[in-house]
């Protein structure tokens, strides 16, 4: 489980950072109240469906400071790992950004932006000290900020501009509505009709060996991998940040799971950022 808190100075890019985290497969919530952090942590740390969470937090308010420290203490006591990313920028850049958007700084009571920035720096000094990562966005574009975050949260891999989400599914439960590419692997021999394989899934070695022993399975996987590699640069060129690839068989337990797993491993070796999940593996 990866639990990330994104905070920092107003105008430093928290919203853009959360968008980048979402593109990297994180479940994101903006403007999250610190007092609710313990309940959310309990929920997600016991969930099998979410393994990466990023929360945008505005910590300017007085009560929020007490809430954040007590909430972080709760996480520590319960051995919930978390990371804090603190975003900042120079006074000159922050002033320019506020003027361009014609927004008033939330802490500038008399209307002077620079006074609000100075006050906010003081209030956030303590949380900045305990941050795991501090990013100065003064000279960063949105794409460069995404690159910085990817260097931190994608295990050192270079972010190639797109997240590939591979999903297995069963046609009997419907085609995924969010799929960009759908591949039907029902042409492959079905392990369902092998009695000893029926209760297993494509995550089991016996099923994997059965599916992948056929030449058509090997050839399909090779051609599928080559095609995806060919397409990815063009999707990136069109500005796509996430590509959802759905692979289906009848029930979503055997063939589709095996092929989805194999495609996931292939693209990981190519150093792409890949997410894998099996939508219908628990259905009967």
Swiss-Prot record:
List of residues binding GTP: 58-61
GO molecular function, one term: GTP binding
InterPro entries: P-loop_NTPase, RapZ-like, RapZ-like_N, RapZ_C
SUPFAM superfamilies cross-referenced by the UniProt entry: P-loop containing nucleoside triphosphate hydrolases (SSF52540)
Keywords for the protein's UniProt record, in alphabetical order: ATP-binding, GTP-binding, Nucleotide-binding
Keyword S-adenosyl-L-methionine on entry: no
Pfam families xrefs: PapZ_C, RapZ-like_N
UniProt-annotated binding residues for ATP: 8-15
NCBIfam families documented for this protein: PRK05416.1
Similarity comment: family membership: Belongs to the RapZ-like family.
Function as written in the Swiss-Prot or TrEMBL entry: Displays ATPase and GTPase activities.
The protein, known as: Nucleotide-binding protein Teth39_0666
